[in-house]
Protein backbone atom coordinates (compact mmCIF):
# COMPACT_ATOMS: atom_id res chain seq x y z
CA UNK A 1 0.00 0.00 0.00
CA UNK A 2 1.43 3.38 -1.03
CA UNK A 3 0.48 6.05 1.50
CA UNK A 4 1.63 9.64 1.89
CA UNK A 5 1.36 11.71 5.04
CA UNK A 6 -1.68 13.99 5.11
CA UNK A 7 -1.56 17.60 6.23
CA UNK A 8 -2.22 16.89 9.90
CA UNK A 9 -2.64 20.60 10.60
CA UNK A 10 -6.12 20.32 9.05
CA UNK A 11 -7.13 17.63 11.54
CA UNK A 12 -9.05 18.27 14.75
CA UNK A 13 -9.47 15.42 17.24
CA UNK A 14 -11.14 15.27 20.65
CA UNK A 15 -9.88 12.67 23.12
CA UNK A 16 -12.10 11.74 26.05
CA UNK A 17 -11.03 9.21 28.64
CA UNK A 18 -9.03 8.25 31.68
CA UNK A 19 -6.12 10.67 32.06
CA UNK A 20 -3.18 9.94 34.31
CA UNK A 21 0.30 11.15 35.16
CA UNK A 22 3.23 8.78 34.62
CA UNK A 23 6.17 9.48 36.91
CA UNK A 24 9.60 7.94 36.33
CA UNK A 25 12.40 7.82 38.90
CA UNK A 26 15.78 6.84 37.46
CA UNK A 27 19.05 6.06 39.18
CA UNK A 28 21.91 3.60 39.63
CA UNK A 29 21.73 0.65 41.99
CA UNK A 30 24.88 -0.92 43.42
CA UNK A 31 23.82 -2.52 46.70
CA UNK A 32 21.08 -4.43 48.49
CA UNK A 33 19.13 -2.79 51.31
CA UNK A 34 20.03 -3.98 54.84
CA UNK A 35 16.32 -3.68 55.72
CA UNK A 36 15.02 -6.18 53.14
CA UNK A 37 16.36 -8.19 50.17
CA UNK A 38 15.67 -5.39 47.67
CA UNK A 39 17.97 -3.16 45.60
CA UNK A 40 18.64 0.41 46.72
CA UNK A 41 18.14 2.92 43.91
CA UNK A 42 19.88 6.27 44.25
CA UNK A 43 17.44 8.48 42.38
CA UNK A 44 19.19 11.11 40.26
CA UNK A 45 16.58 11.88 37.59
CA UNK A 46 12.82 12.40 37.85
CA UNK A 47 10.52 12.66 34.82
CA UNK A 48 6.80 13.28 34.50
CA UNK A 49 4.84 12.36 31.38
CA UNK A 50 1.12 12.44 30.54
CA UNK A 51 -0.31 8.91 30.36
CA UNK A 52 -3.50 7.09 29.44
CA UNK A 53 -5.87 9.24 27.40
CA UNK A 54 -3.43 12.13 27.85
CA UNK A 55 -0.77 10.18 25.96
CA UNK A 56 -3.24 9.66 23.11
CA UNK A 57 -3.79 13.42 22.97
CA UNK A 58 -0.02 14.01 22.97
CA UNK A 59 0.44 11.61 20.08
CA UNK A 60 -2.13 13.57 18.10
CA UNK A 61 -0.53 16.92 18.94
CA UNK A 62 2.97 15.64 18.07
CA UNK A 63 1.77 15.18 14.48
CA UNK A 64 0.76 18.83 14.28
CA UNK A 65 -2.99 18.16 14.54
CA UNK A 66 -5.35 20.13 16.77
CA UNK A 67 -5.67 18.00 19.90
CA UNK A 68 -8.34 18.51 22.55
CA UNK A 69 -8.55 16.49 25.76
CA UNK A 70 -11.37 15.92 28.25
CA UNK A 71 -10.97 13.81 31.38
CA UNK A 72 -11.35 13.65 35.15
CA UNK A 73 -8.67 14.85 37.57
CA UNK A 74 -8.36 15.78 41.20
CA UNK A 75 -7.39 19.22 42.43
CA UNK A 76 -3.78 18.47 43.29
CA UNK A 77 -0.14 18.77 42.23
CA UNK A 78 -0.50 15.84 39.82
CA UNK A 79 -3.34 17.61 37.98
CA UNK A 80 -1.31 20.80 37.74
CA UNK A 81 1.74 18.91 36.48
CA UNK A 82 -0.39 17.06 33.93
CA UNK A 83 -1.97 20.27 32.63
CA UNK A 84 1.39 22.02 32.43
CA UNK A 85 3.03 19.16 30.49
CA UNK A 86 0.14 18.99 28.04
CA UNK A 87 0.02 22.74 27.48
CA UNK A 88 3.72 22.65 26.60
CA UNK A 89 2.97 20.36 23.64
CA UNK A 90 -0.11 22.29 22.50
CA UNK A 91 -2.80 19.94 23.84
CA UNK A 92 -5.95 21.90 24.71
CA UNK A 93 -7.07 20.57 28.11
CA UNK A 94 -10.63 20.88 29.39
CA UNK A 95 -10.55 18.72 32.51
CA UNK A 96 -13.40 18.15 34.94
CA UNK A 97 -11.92 18.68 38.41
CA UNK A 98 -13.24 16.37 41.13
CA UNK A 99 -12.21 17.62 44.61
CA UNK A 100 -12.97 14.31 46.34
CA UNK A 101 -10.60 12.21 44.21
CA UNK A 102 -6.85 12.29 43.48
CA UNK A 103 -5.51 12.49 39.95
CA UNK A 104 -4.52 8.99 38.81
CA UNK A 105 -0.73 8.69 39.06
CA UNK A 106 1.60 5.80 38.24
CA UNK A 107 5.17 5.87 39.56
CA UNK A 108 7.83 3.67 37.98
CA UNK A 109 11.32 3.18 39.45
CA UNK A 110 13.98 2.25 36.89
CA UNK A 111 17.67 1.43 36.97
CA UNK A 112 19.88 0.62 33.98
CA UNK A 113 16.82 0.79 31.69
CA UNK A 114 15.05 -1.90 33.75
CA UNK A 115 11.77 -1.24 35.56
CA UNK A 116 12.05 -2.43 39.16
CA UNK A 117 8.62 -1.55 40.55
CA UNK A 118 5.45 0.39 39.72
CA UNK A 119 3.33 2.16 42.33
CA UNK A 120 -0.24 3.24 41.50
CA UNK A 121 -1.99 6.13 43.25
CA UNK A 122 -5.68 6.04 42.35
CA UNK A 123 -9.21 5.62 43.61
CA UNK A 124 -11.06 5.64 40.30
CA UNK A 125 -13.91 7.99 39.43
CA UNK A 126 -16.92 5.69 39.71
CA UNK A 127 -20.07 7.58 40.64
CA UNK A 128 -18.88 10.95 39.31
CA UNK A 129 -21.58 12.91 37.41
CA UNK A 130 -20.87 12.45 33.65
CA UNK A 131 -22.91 15.50 32.57
CA UNK A 132 -19.92 17.92 32.47
CA UNK A 133 -18.15 15.51 30.11
CA UNK A 134 -21.24 15.28 27.87
CA UNK A 135 -21.36 19.08 27.68
CA UNK A 136 -17.70 19.34 26.70
CA UNK A 137 -18.16 16.73 23.96
CA UNK A 138 -21.22 18.51 22.60
CA UNK A 139 -19.32 21.81 22.43
CA UNK A 140 -16.35 20.27 20.60
CA UNK A 141 -18.16 18.12 18.02
CA UNK A 142 -18.64 20.87 15.38
CA UNK A 143 -14.87 21.53 15.39
CA UNK A 144 -13.46 17.99 15.13
CA UNK A 145 -13.05 15.26 12.53
CA UNK A 146 -12.82 12.36 14.97
CA UNK A 147 -13.65 11.48 18.58
CA UNK A 148 -11.37 9.11 20.50
CA UNK A 149 -12.63 7.38 23.64
CA UNK A 150 -9.66 6.02 25.61
CA UNK A 151 -10.89 3.55 28.21
CA UNK A 152 -8.69 2.41 31.10
CA UNK A 153 -11.70 1.47 33.28
CA UNK A 154 -11.04 4.28 35.76
CA UNK A 155 -14.51 5.86 35.53
CA UNK A 156 -14.32 8.64 32.93
CA UNK A 157 -16.16 6.50 30.35
CA UNK A 158 -18.76 4.89 32.60
CA UNK A 159 -21.45 6.46 30.38
CA UNK A 160 -19.69 5.65 27.13
CA UNK A 161 -22.86 4.76 25.22
CA UNK A 162 -24.19 8.30 25.56
CA UNK A 163 -20.90 9.63 24.19
CA UNK A 164 -21.10 7.29 21.19
CA UNK A 165 -24.62 8.45 20.41
CA UNK A 166 -23.62 12.12 20.63
CA UNK A 167 -20.87 11.52 18.05
CA UNK A 168 -23.09 9.45 15.76
CA UNK A 169 -25.76 12.15 15.78
CA UNK A 170 -23.12 14.69 14.71
CA UNK A 171 -21.78 12.24 12.06
CA UNK A 172 -18.34 12.27 13.68
CA UNK A 173 -16.45 8.93 13.64
CA UNK A 174 -15.86 7.56 17.13
CA UNK A 175 -12.79 5.39 17.75
CA UNK A 176 -12.46 3.43 20.98
CA UNK A 177 -9.51 1.78 22.70
CA UNK A 178 -11.56 -0.71 24.77
CA UNK A 179 -11.03 -2.15 28.23
CA UNK A 180 -12.44 -5.37 29.66
CA UNK A 181 -14.57 -8.03 28.04
CA UNK A 182 -17.92 -6.20 27.90
CA UNK A 183 -17.92 -4.91 24.33
CA UNK A 184 -21.71 -4.44 24.45
CA UNK A 185 -21.10 -1.04 26.03
CA UNK A 186 -19.29 0.05 22.84
CA UNK A 187 -22.19 -0.84 20.53
CA UNK A 188 -22.45 1.45 17.50
CA UNK A 189 -18.86 2.72 17.55
CA UNK A 190 -17.07 3.38 14.27
CA UNK A 191 -13.97 1.42 15.25
CA UNK A 192 -12.64 -0.60 18.19
CA UNK A 193 -8.88 -1.19 18.58
CA UNK A 194 -8.44 -4.09 21.04
CA UNK A 195 -5.11 -5.86 21.37
CA UNK A 196 -5.08 -9.61 20.82
CA UNK A 197 -5.52 -10.55 24.48
CA UNK A 198 -8.46 -8.13 24.86
CA UNK A 199 -10.01 -9.50 21.66
CA UNK A 200 -9.64 -13.14 22.76
CA UNK A 201 -11.08 -12.32 26.19
CA UNK A 202 -14.32 -11.59 24.32
CA UNK A 203 -14.34 -14.19 21.52
CA UNK A 204 -12.15 -16.95 23.00
CA UNK A 205 -8.73 -18.23 21.95
CA UNK A 206 -8.20 -18.26 18.18
CA UNK A 207 -6.19 -21.25 16.93
CA UNK A 208 -5.47 -19.75 13.53
CA UNK A 209 -6.00 -16.79 11.22
CA UNK A 210 -9.31 -18.13 9.93
CA UNK A 211 -10.80 -18.28 13.42
CA UNK A 212 -9.59 -14.77 14.23
CA UNK A 213 -11.22 -13.36 11.10
CA UNK A 214 -14.53 -15.23 11.45
CA UNK A 215 -14.94 -14.40 15.14
CA UNK A 216 -13.91 -10.82 14.54
CA UNK A 217 -16.45 -10.38 11.75
CA UNK A 218 -19.15 -11.81 14.01
CA UNK A 219 -18.18 -9.34 16.72
CA UNK A 220 -18.44 -6.48 14.20
CA UNK A 221 -21.96 -7.60 13.25
CA UNK A 222 -23.12 -8.32 16.82
CA UNK A 223 -22.15 -4.89 18.13
CA UNK A 224 -23.00 -2.88 15.00
CA UNK A 225 -19.44 -1.66 14.51
CA UNK A 226 -18.18 -0.14 11.27
CA UNK A 227 -14.79 -1.79 11.72
CA UNK A 228 -12.50 -3.65 14.10
CA UNK A 229 -8.71 -3.31 14.30
CA UNK A 230 -6.97 -6.06 16.27
CA UNK A 231 -3.41 -5.13 17.25
CA UNK A 232 -1.29 -8.27 17.48
CA UNK A 233 2.13 -7.21 18.76
CA UNK A 234 4.90 -8.90 16.71
CA UNK A 235 2.25 -10.20 14.27
CA UNK A 236 1.21 -6.68 13.26
CA UNK A 237 -2.48 -5.76 13.08
CA UNK A 238 -5.61 -6.90 11.28
CA UNK A 239 -8.45 -4.65 10.06
CA UNK A 240 -11.91 -6.20 9.66
CA UNK A 241 -14.81 -4.45 7.90
CA UNK A 242 -18.22 -5.75 6.73
CA UNK A 243 -18.22 -6.65 3.05
CA UNK A 244 -14.46 -6.28 2.63
CA UNK A 245 -11.60 -8.80 2.80
CA UNK A 246 -9.47 -8.61 5.95
CA UNK A 247 -6.45 -6.32 5.74
CA UNK A 248 -3.37 -7.63 7.53
CA UNK A 249 -0.49 -5.23 8.21
CA UNK A 250 2.77 -6.89 9.33
CA UNK A 251 4.74 -5.26 12.15
CA UNK A 252 7.32 -2.63 11.21
CA UNK A 253 9.16 -2.68 14.54
CA UNK A 254 12.93 -3.13 14.19
CA UNK A 255 13.63 -3.43 17.93
CA UNK A 256 11.29 -3.49 20.92
CA UNK A 257 12.46 -1.64 24.03
CA UNK A 258 9.12 -0.84 25.67
CA UNK A 259 5.48 -1.35 24.66
CA UNK A 260 4.21 1.21 27.21
CA UNK A 261 1.65 3.43 25.47
CA UNK A 262 1.95 1.76 22.06
CA UNK A 263 -1.83 1.34 21.89
CA UNK A 264 -2.19 5.06 22.57
CA UNK A 265 0.04 5.81 19.60
CA UNK A 266 -1.97 3.51 17.32
CA UNK A 267 -5.34 5.08 18.04
CA UNK A 268 -3.92 8.62 18.16
CA UNK A 269 -2.25 8.43 14.74
CA UNK A 270 -5.24 6.58 13.29
CA UNK A 271 -7.68 9.26 14.48
CA UNK A 272 -5.49 12.14 13.28
CA UNK A 273 -5.10 10.57 9.84
CA UNK A 274 -8.85 9.96 9.53
CA UNK A 275 -9.61 13.52 10.61
CA UNK A 276 -7.10 14.78 8.02
CA UNK A 277 -8.95 12.98 5.23
CA UNK A 278 -7.19 9.62 4.86
CA UNK A 279 -9.20 6.45 4.30
CA UNK A 280 -9.52 3.96 7.15
CA UNK A 281 -7.11 1.58 5.41
CA UNK A 282 -4.52 4.33 4.89
CA UNK A 283 -4.94 5.50 8.47
CA UNK A 284 -4.33 1.97 9.78
CA UNK A 285 -1.19 1.73 7.65
CA UNK A 286 0.15 4.93 9.21
CA UNK A 287 -0.82 3.79 12.71
CA UNK A 288 1.02 0.51 12.19
CA UNK A 289 4.15 2.35 11.04
CA UNK A 290 3.93 4.67 14.06
CA UNK A 291 3.65 1.70 16.43
CA UNK A 292 6.84 0.28 14.94
CA UNK A 293 8.64 3.52 15.80
CA UNK A 294 7.31 4.05 19.31
CA UNK A 295 8.04 0.56 20.69
CA UNK A 296 11.70 1.28 19.93
CA UNK A 297 11.67 4.02 22.59
CA UNK A 298 11.75 3.70 26.37
CA UNK A 299 8.64 4.75 28.30
CA UNK A 300 5.44 6.45 27.21
CA UNK A 301 6.36 8.12 23.91
CA UNK A 302 5.03 9.88 20.84
CA UNK A 303 6.01 9.87 17.17
CA UNK A 304 6.85 12.92 15.04
CA UNK A 305 5.85 13.46 11.40
CA UNK A 306 9.47 13.03 10.33
CA UNK A 307 9.79 9.71 12.18
CA UNK A 308 6.53 8.58 10.60
CA UNK A 309 7.67 9.72 7.15
CA UNK A 310 10.94 7.83 7.59
CA UNK A 311 9.07 4.71 8.70
CA UNK A 312 6.67 4.58 5.75
CA UNK A 313 9.49 5.27 3.29
CA UNK A 314 11.79 2.71 4.88
CA UNK A 315 14.38 5.30 5.89
CA UNK A 316 14.40 4.66 9.63
CA UNK A 317 17.65 2.70 9.45
CA UNK A 318 19.53 4.62 6.77
CA UNK A 319 22.18 5.75 9.25
CA UNK A 320 22.09 9.52 8.55
CA UNK A 321 19.70 12.47 8.76
CA UNK A 322 16.93 13.23 11.27
CA UNK A 323 16.74 10.58 13.99
CA UNK A 324 15.30 9.81 17.39
CA UNK A 325 17.62 9.06 20.31
CA UNK A 326 17.62 5.28 19.93
CA UNK A 327 18.49 5.51 16.23
CA UNK A 328 21.22 8.04 17.00
CA UNK A 329 22.82 5.83 19.66
CA UNK A 330 22.98 2.98 17.15
CA UNK A 331 24.48 5.25 14.46
CA UNK A 332 27.09 6.62 16.89
CA UNK A 333 28.04 3.10 17.97
CA UNK A 334 28.56 2.13 14.33
CA UNK A 335 30.66 5.26 13.72
CA UNK A 336 32.91 4.41 16.66
CA UNK A 337 33.37 0.89 15.35
CA UNK A 338 34.72 2.54 12.20
CA UNK A 339 37.11 4.62 14.31
CA UNK A 340 35.33 7.91 13.54
CA UNK A 341 35.45 10.94 15.86
CA UNK A 342 31.98 12.17 16.84
CA UNK A 343 31.37 15.90 17.38
CA UNK A 344 28.16 17.22 18.97
CA UNK A 345 26.61 20.67 19.23
CA UNK A 346 23.17 22.03 19.99
CA UNK A 347 20.87 24.99 19.56
CA UNK A 348 17.46 26.27 18.47
CA UNK A 349 18.43 27.11 14.85
CA UNK A 350 15.11 28.89 14.32
CA UNK A 351 15.95 30.86 11.16
CA UNK A 352 19.04 29.27 9.65
CA UNK A 353 21.49 31.95 8.48
CA UNK A 354 25.07 32.29 7.21
CA UNK A 355 26.44 32.44 10.75
CA UNK A 356 24.87 29.08 11.56
CA UNK A 357 26.16 27.48 8.36
CA UNK A 358 29.71 28.74 8.94
CA UNK A 359 29.67 27.61 12.58
CA UNK A 360 28.40 24.12 11.73
CA UNK A 361 30.95 23.73 8.94
CA UNK A 362 33.75 24.65 11.36
CA UNK A 363 32.39 22.23 13.98
CA UNK A 364 32.31 19.43 11.42
CA UNK A 365 35.98 20.00 10.55
CA UNK A 366 36.90 19.05 14.12
CA UNK A 367 35.85 15.43 13.64
CA UNK A 368 34.39 12.85 11.29
CA UNK A 369 30.68 13.07 12.21
CA UNK A 370 28.57 15.98 13.48
CA UNK A 371 25.47 15.64 15.66
CA UNK A 372 23.16 18.65 15.97
CA UNK A 373 20.73 18.48 18.90
CA UNK A 374 17.74 20.81 18.44
CA UNK A 375 15.45 22.32 21.07
CA UNK A 376 11.81 21.25 20.76
CA UNK A 377 9.12 23.87 20.16
CA UNK A 378 8.08 23.75 23.83
CA UNK A 379 11.68 24.15 24.99
CA UNK A 380 12.18 27.08 22.60
CA UNK A 381 9.09 28.86 23.93
CA UNK A 382 10.37 28.50 27.49
CA UNK A 383 13.73 29.98 26.53
CA UNK A 384 12.75 32.59 23.93
CA UNK A 385 9.12 33.46 24.65
CA UNK A 386 5.68 32.57 23.29
CA UNK A 387 6.33 34.01 19.80
CA UNK A 388 9.18 31.61 19.13
CA UNK A 389 10.04 29.48 17.34
CA UNK A 390 9.19 31.03 13.99
CA UNK A 391 9.75 27.66 12.30
CA UNK A 392 8.42 24.47 13.95
CA UNK A 393 10.78 21.70 15.03
CA UNK A 394 10.21 19.42 12.04
CA UNK A 395 11.06 22.19 9.56
CA UNK A 396 14.15 23.26 11.53
CA UNK A 397 15.44 19.68 11.58
CA UNK A 398 14.79 19.13 7.86
CA UNK A 399 16.81 22.23 6.94
CA UNK A 400 19.69 21.27 9.26
CA UNK A 401 19.70 17.72 7.93
CA UNK A 402 20.09 19.04 4.39
CA UNK A 403 23.42 20.73 5.21
CA UNK A 404 26.52 18.92 3.97
CA UNK A 405 28.29 19.48 7.30
CA UNK A 406 25.57 17.82 9.39
CA UNK A 407 25.38 14.04 9.73
CA UNK A 408 22.70 13.56 12.37
CA UNK A 409 19.91 15.77 13.75
CA UNK A 410 18.09 14.83 16.97
CA UNK A 411 15.45 16.73 19.00
CA UNK A 412 15.38 17.15 22.78
CA UNK A 413 12.56 18.35 25.05
CA UNK A 414 14.48 19.81 28.00
CA UNK A 415 15.83 23.37 28.26
CA UNK A 416 19.39 22.02 27.92
CA UNK A 417 20.68 18.86 26.21
CA UNK A 418 22.62 17.72 29.30
CA UNK A 419 20.77 14.40 29.61
CA UNK A 420 21.11 13.69 25.89
CA UNK A 421 24.82 14.56 25.89
CA UNK A 422 25.39 12.30 28.91
CA UNK A 423 23.64 9.51 27.04
CA UNK A 424 25.55 9.96 23.76
CA UNK A 425 28.94 11.06 25.22
CA UNK A 426 30.45 12.57 22.06
CA UNK A 427 34.22 12.63 21.61
CA UNK A 428 34.04 16.41 21.26
CA UNK A 429 31.33 18.77 22.53
CA UNK A 430 31.21 22.13 20.73
CA UNK A 431 29.28 25.30 21.55
CA UNK A 432 29.26 28.67 19.82
CA UNK A 433 29.45 32.03 21.55
CA UNK A 434 31.29 33.52 24.53
CA UNK A 435 30.82 30.60 26.92
CA UNK A 436 33.53 29.23 29.15
CA UNK A 437 33.93 25.47 28.57
CA UNK A 438 32.79 24.58 32.10
CA UNK A 439 29.57 26.59 31.57
CA UNK A 440 28.44 24.42 28.67
CA UNK A 441 25.66 21.92 29.45
CA UNK A 442 27.05 18.39 29.36
CA UNK A 443 30.70 19.44 29.62
CA UNK A 444 31.28 17.67 32.95
CA UNK A 445 29.90 14.40 31.58
CA UNK A 446 32.01 14.61 28.41
CA UNK A 447 35.20 15.38 30.36
CA UNK A 448 34.49 12.54 32.80
CA UNK A 449 34.27 10.14 29.84
CA UNK A 450 37.61 11.34 28.46
CA UNK A 451 36.18 13.65 25.79
CA UNK A 452 36.93 17.26 24.83
CA UNK A 453 34.92 20.49 25.06
CA UNK A 454 35.56 23.44 22.73
CA UNK A 455 34.04 26.90 22.18
CA UNK A 456 33.81 28.30 18.64
CA UNK A 457 33.14 31.90 17.64
CA UNK A 458 29.92 32.93 15.89
CA UNK A 459 30.03 35.28 12.89
CA UNK A 460 29.66 38.84 14.20
CA UNK A 461 26.47 40.76 13.49
CA UNK A 462 24.40 37.81 12.31
CA UNK A 463 21.68 36.39 14.57
CA UNK A 464 18.13 35.08 14.38
CA UNK A 465 16.95 37.86 16.70
CA UNK A 466 18.43 40.53 14.42
CA UNK A 467 16.86 38.93 11.35
CA UNK A 468 13.43 38.85 13.01
CA UNK A 469 13.80 42.50 14.07
CA UNK A 470 14.84 43.52 10.54
CA UNK A 471 11.75 41.81 9.13
CA UNK A 472 9.55 43.61 11.67
CA UNK A 473 11.16 46.95 10.83
CA UNK A 474 10.64 46.33 7.12
CA UNK A 475 7.00 45.43 7.61
CA UNK A 476 6.47 48.41 9.84
Curated annotation (Swiss-Prot):
It catalyses: D-glycero-beta-D-manno-heptose 7-phosphate + ATP = D-glycero-beta-D-manno-heptose 1,7-bisphosphate + ADP + H(+); D-glycero-beta-D-manno-heptose 1-phosphate + ATP + H(+) = ADP-D-glycero-beta-D-manno-heptose + diphosphate. ATP binds at residues 195-198. The active site is at 264. Gene3D superfamilies: 3.40.1190.20, HUPs (3.40.50.620). Its EC number is 2.7.1.167, 2.7.7.70. Catalyzes the ADP transfer from ATP to D-glycero-beta-D-manno-heptose 1-phosphate, yielding ADP-D-glycero-beta-D-manno-heptose. In the N-terminal section; belongs to the carbohydrate kinase PfkB family. Homodimer. This is Bifunctional protein HldE.
Amino acid sequence: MKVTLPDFRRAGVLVVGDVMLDRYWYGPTSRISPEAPVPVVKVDTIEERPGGAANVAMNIASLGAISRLVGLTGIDDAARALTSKLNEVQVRCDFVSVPTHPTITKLRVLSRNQQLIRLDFEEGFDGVDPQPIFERIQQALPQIGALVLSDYAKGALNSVQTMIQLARKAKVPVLIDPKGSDFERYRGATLLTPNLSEFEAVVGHCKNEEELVSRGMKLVADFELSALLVTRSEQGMTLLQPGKPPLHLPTQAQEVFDVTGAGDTVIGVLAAALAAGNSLEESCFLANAAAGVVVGKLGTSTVSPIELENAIRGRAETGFGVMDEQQLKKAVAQARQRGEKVVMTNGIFDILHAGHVSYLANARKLGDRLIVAVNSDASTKRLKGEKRPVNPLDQRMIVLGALEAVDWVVPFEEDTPQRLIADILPDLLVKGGDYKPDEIAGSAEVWAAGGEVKVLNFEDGVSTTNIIQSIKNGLG
